[in-house]
Amino acid sequence: MAVKIRLKRLGKIRAPYYRIVVADSRTKRDGRVIEEIGKYHPTEEPSFIEVQSERAQYWLSVGAQPTEQVEALLKLTGDWGRFKGDKDAVSTVRVREAKPAYVADEKKKPVLKPKTEKAAPAPEAAAPEAESTEEQA
């Protein structure tokens, strides 16, 4: 059985994101997979790349062939270099900077008004109406 490591496309039109999967080479692009080993979001800035290194190394060691795109991603994460024997392979994936935490200004503290309970309709007002209808009948 020929096994490939390739990209499975998800997302909307013009907004793709991919899963890095291990699948039989004869299956459809988005068909049945053996295992999902990572994610790739090319539309984010910088691109989001996440690969489970242990699983990628395992599948490469048992003969799975990566496609050109996946091979490029594995080179970025350093997994391809480790597979080829380079013990010092390092990930060159850029990571998004964390957003600073939002701190609310104490002077502009929002004012919360307590909710007022709606008064129940007075039973006295409803009772005379009921009596008047009985008198008319």
Curated annotation (Swiss-Prot):
Similarity-based family: Belongs to the bacterial ribosomal protein bS16 family.
Residue stretches of biased makeup (Basic and acidic residues): 104-118
Keywords: Ribonucleoprotein, Ribosomal protein
Keyword Signal listed: no
Name recorded for this polypeptide: Small ribosomal subunit protein bS16
Example of a GO MF term: structural constituent of ribosome
GO BP term (any one): translation
Region span, Disordered: 104-137
Stretches with biased composition (Low complexity): 119-130
Endoplasmic reticulum listed as a keyword: no
One cellular component term from this protein's GO annotations in UniProt: cytoplasm
Alphabetical list of Gene3D superfamilies matching this protein: 3.30.1320.10
